[in-house]
Amino acid sequence: MRAILRFAILALACFLVAVGGGCEQAATPEPKLGDFANPQRVTILGYNDHAMEPFVSRDGKYLFFNNSNEAVDTNLHWAERIDDLTFQYKGEIGGVNTAALEGVASMDRNGVFYFVSTRSYDETSSTIYRGSFDNGTITGIELAPGVSTATPGIVNFDAEISPDGNTLYFVESQFGSSGPQNANILIATWNGSAFVRDSNSATIMKQVNTSKNLEYAPAISSSGLELFFTRLVESSPVLYVATRTDASSPFGAPRKITAATGFVEGPTLSPGEKSLYYHKREGSLFVIYRVTRP
């Protein structure tokens, strides 16, 4: 089951590029004044392994991340903020990790914690879970109701919850015998007891999702007007942002986050939304970086 997680999807997509069936370059607007700049590496004191899929809690106190997606046992970890570029490692998050894969953390302002796990995919064809985070431990873990279609071969391998907890931005991928056929970002809203898929997702995401690229790792601003995500372009993942004028309108044409160079994925905003964190491959190690805007 680990073969259908993000690292495998990207590895296969890169292979397809090499044999001539790869991803299509999408046109993007030029950078604008006020875009993100000044990439800087983040330090996690007391931790020297891979750090991927960063998420900064809405109050700015904690950094959640997972170790390498290619690890035999990928687990969720947490660290406490010292400053914008320095966090103190606290260990694995309690109550959540299993022998399966756990990763891709996000959390709303009320401490409802979301993550991806393969623990029950063979039985449920579902991967997005939620629980309550408190002082380094997650309790009350359950499948996020209403998100999955529970269809074998369809995989939700990324998600981020909005700050208010009312909207889930998630990724859905259809798998065939040769691997992923697509990966698109969809939307679901919370109705008080379950999520309901937004019937307008295709319209809202029309300029974000593409037919030949993979779009994944969504991150939404508190206003709902900025959507950050990763797109696999040719053989490399690239960070993008798409904007809109109101929270019910479609997103416009995405722009590259040009300051985030190299093999980069998994953007996430700081609480003040002046910093964008992401992971980057440096040599054989994945580390966390930050870019900033005025």
List each language-model region with its residue ranges:
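Bacterial N-terminal signal peptides
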Residues: 8-18
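Short, conserved micro-motifs composed of acidic
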Residues: 27-294
